[in-house]
């Protein structure tokens, strides 16, 4: 382990084999907490390569829980977090809109690390049981078309990494890895990151992980979602090719809002915001959700443009389909 950390300290990249070996040792309890923290910091300072990120994701997925389900076209819209925007739970709210629009949403998430409320926190406040067994979660998914997978329970091997990660208190390769290690073999994905310089390389990792179609999004002001406060950049993975583009609210015929307009609060406050959006109450929260759900529909390939996706998201919410999915999840995942 010492040799690996010294190599990273010299800003030398690890091979896929080296990274695989290191992570296997970590997730089987053979590395100290201090060494793990040093590794995470060294990788962050050097800059993580697609090969390193693919290797860690493949190892972590190999140690994840298996969710038995009859659904084979699941999608997720989990972001990396770590943007310190203190926004409401955008992707979690948008997940219900996507599910209401007919997409099988397997929402993967965790408790907050750098904000007041993570996806697990807000859903727990809404009565969702975070601790169902994998077989029970599979049944929920089959019955409702939506399920929440609590990352802590899905990845028992993460217990070896979490103490060092929490102690550091800064975004590391594990933030970048979280959305990549979904327990299910996803076909499509919308993945938010707070570092736009990693758009293309993250799309490359998704390609390496077998995604058929995906979008990696980096919003304005470091937001790890699409934003109405400036220019949003995306990388689209389609037919094995990656293309980069950007858009503004004006491009989509939408009104702009400042970052402070979408500030959230604690889990209970964010739960109330989520409900207000699904009830179609006009606000910057609603508009931001519509934007991100629209981008999700486009990432899934359900429609042909982000603008069409935004229109579909509005219809789904207005018809009560998104709220209906929340009620179903509350009924079955309890």
From Swiss-Prot:
* Recorded metabolic or biological pathway in which this protein acts: Amino-acid biosynthesis; L-tryptophan biosynthesis; L-tryptophan from chorismate: step 2/5
Segments crossing the lipid bilayer: none
Q: Does the keyword Phosphoprotein apply?
A: no
Supply the alphabetized keyword list: Amino-acid biosynthesis, Aromatic amino acid biosynthesis, Glycosyltransferase, Magnesium, Metal-binding, Transferase, Tryptophan biosynthesis
* Classification via InterPro entries: Anthranilate_Pribosyl_Tfrase, Glycosyl_Trfase_fam3, Glycosyl_Trfase_fam3_N_dom, Glycosyl_Trfase_fam3_N_dom_sf, Nuc_phospho_transferase
List GO BP terms, alphabetically: L-tryptophan biosynthetic process
GO CC list: cytosol
The cofactor note from the UniProt entry for this protein is: Binds 2 magnesium ions per monomer.
Q: Which reaction does it catalyse?
A: N-(5-phospho-beta-D-ribosyl)anthranilate + diphosphate = 5-phospho-alpha-D-ribose 1-diphosphate + anthranilate
Entry's Gene Ontology molecular function annotations: anthranilate phosphoribosyltransferase activity; magnesium ion binding
Annotated Mg(2+) 1 binding lies at 91, 225
Task: Report residues binding anthranilate 2.
Answer: 165
Q: Does the keyword Secreted apply?
A: no
Q: Which cofactor does it need?
A: Mg(2+)
What family is this protein classified in? Belongs to the anthranilate phosphoribosyltransferase family.
- PANTHER family membership: ANTHRANILATE PHOSPHORIBOSYLTRANSFERASE (PTHR43285:SF2)
The protein's assembly and partners: Homodimer.
Task: Return the protein name.
Answer: Anthranilate phosphoribosyltransferase
Gene assigned in the entry:
trpD
């Amino acid at each position: 382990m010492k040799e690996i950390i010294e190599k990273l300290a010299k800003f030398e990249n690890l091979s896929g084999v080296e990274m695989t070996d290191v992570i296997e040792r970590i997730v089987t309890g053979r590395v100290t907490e201090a060494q793990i923290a040093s590794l995470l910091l060294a990788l962050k300072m050097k800059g993580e390569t697609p090969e390193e990120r693919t290797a860690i994701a493949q190892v972590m997925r190999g140690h994840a829980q298996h969710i038995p389900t009859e659904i084979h076209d699941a999608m997720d819209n989990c972001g990396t977090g770590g943007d310190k925007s203190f926004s409401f739970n955008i992707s979690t709210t948008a997940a219900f809109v996507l599910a209401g629009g007919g997409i099988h949403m397997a929402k993967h998430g965790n408790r907050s690390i750098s904000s007041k409320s993570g996806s697990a926190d807000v859903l727990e406040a809404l009565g969702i049981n975070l601790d169902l067994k994998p077989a029970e979660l599979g049944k929920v998914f089959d019955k409702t078309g939506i399920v929440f997978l609590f990352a802590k329970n899905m990845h028992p091997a993460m217990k070896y990494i979490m103490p060092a990660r929490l102690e550091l208190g800064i975004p590391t390769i594990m933030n970048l890895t979280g959305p990549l290690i979904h327990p299910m073999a996803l076909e499509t994905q919308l993945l938010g990151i707070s570092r736009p310089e990693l758009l293309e390389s993250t799309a490359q990792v998704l390609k390496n992980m077998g995604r058929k179609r995906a979008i990696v999004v980096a919003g304005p002001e470091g937001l790890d979602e699409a934003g109405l406060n400036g220019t949003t950049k995306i990388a689209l993975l389609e037919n094995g090719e990656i293309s980069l583009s950007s858009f503004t609210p004006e491009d989509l015929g939408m009104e702009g809002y400042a970052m402070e307009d979408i500030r959230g609060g604690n889990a209970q406050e964010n739960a109330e915001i989520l409900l207000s959006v699904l009830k179609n109450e006009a606000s910057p929260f609603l508009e931001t959700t519509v934007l991100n759900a629209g981008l999700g529909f486009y990432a899934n390939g359900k429609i042909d443009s982000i603008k069409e996706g935004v229109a579909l998201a509005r219809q789904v919410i207005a018809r009560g389909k998104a709220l209906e999915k929340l009620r179903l999840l509350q009924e079955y995942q309890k």
